[in-house]
Amino acid sequence: MRIIAGVAKGRTLGTVAGATRPTSDRAREALFSSLLSEFGDFLGIHLLDLFGGSGAIGLEALSRGASCVHIVEKDVDAQKTIENNFELVNKNRPPGKFHLYSMSVQRFVSDPPKDKYHIVYIDPPYEFLDSEVEEILSKLHTGGFLKDDALIAVERTAKRSNFSWPDGFTAVRDRNYGQATIFYGNYTPKNG
């Protein structure tokens, strides 16, 4: 797995053996293509990566110039991998700020927000119920974590997901990438 673009382009990232299911390079490339079409570039962007795994999504955004990247991951082995991957990406001196929150996503979204985010990427373990993901989204909405018109991307298994957006969000599109589907939605607080 490599950083696709930006100042750390080509850097090989470590993965967590067995504990996580990394987003495929194809899906990651498509995700960032969608984000670029939405935002133009990553300058000034604040991104939140929930269930960070290897940190590839957040670190890709950092490499591309995001101003602030926060990753939330509770697994200790994954945290070490994210820290090691950050050190690799940081050798190229990306301009943005980075912070790893070593806690559960449920705890993170129950605490006061650390920032307001333009982009949130949520990639929970496949055994997470859709209702649990919808609860996290509701807490992002009611907790004040999101900038108006924030873009949310939720990765779920293509096999059994009945994912739907809760109040405060509008579905934009969904795309299948092998075993995964990424659902895109906009934060629309006036609708919730």
PLM feature spans:
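Class I S-adenosyl-L-methionine-dependent methyltransferase catalytic core
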Residues: 1-192
